[in-house]
């Protein structure tokens, strides 16, 4: 019931996208929905059109605006709710930049990347760090942010 409440809350708060993307990705990969929500909160603030071009964040108001920005960006671009790096992961999944703007697909790809990172590291939280960066000093700060967000998600869900 708590998951349903949070998903309804998100669907009304998050630019109208269907928040069940997180639940579907969780079911498909085994990654806890709460962890996916926490990562998305840290990565994009639940903004489905969030784009980061070479370290510079943008929050386009519309998909149209986001597509224009993506056309002008190079390969080093993070896209969508889960800030999937297109230069690295786009080719591995055979996806275009515009495809990664789809919230359902973006969250699923992010969950699959996290699943890969968890397997590679052997730990949930090491996997979270690896999701962000292969460099350990960047991982620690990121894991702390996600941990705080994760606790917030759990609080909102009443668990």
Kindly give the residue locations of the regions a language model identified:
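Catalytic glycan-binding domains that act on GlcNAc-containing polysaccharides
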Residues: 15-159
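N-terminal signal peptide c-region/cleavage motif recognized by signal peptidases
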Residues: 10-13
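Bacterial N-terminal signal peptides that target proteins for export
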Residues: 1-2
């Amino acid at each position: 019931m708590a998951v349903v409440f949070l998903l309804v809350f998100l669907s009304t708060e998050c630019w109208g996208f269907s928040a069940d993307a997180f639940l579907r990705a969780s079911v498909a990969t085994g990654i806890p929905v709460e962890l996916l929500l926490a990562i998305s909160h840290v990565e994009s603030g639940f903004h489905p059109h969030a784009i980061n071009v070479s370290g510079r964040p943008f929050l386009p108001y519309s998909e149209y605006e986001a597509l224009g920005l993506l056309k002008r960006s190079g390969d080093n671009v993070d896209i969508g709710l889960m800030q999937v790096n297109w230069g690295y992961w786009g080719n591995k999944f055979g996806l275009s930049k515009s495809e990664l703007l789809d919230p359902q697909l973006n969250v699923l790809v992010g969950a699959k990347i996290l699943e890969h990172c968890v397997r590679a590291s052997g730990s949930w939280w090491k996997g979270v760090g690896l999701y962000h960066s292969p460099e350990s000093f960047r991982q620690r700060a990121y894991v702390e942010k996600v941990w705080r967000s994760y606790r917030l998600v759990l609080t909102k869900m009443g668990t």
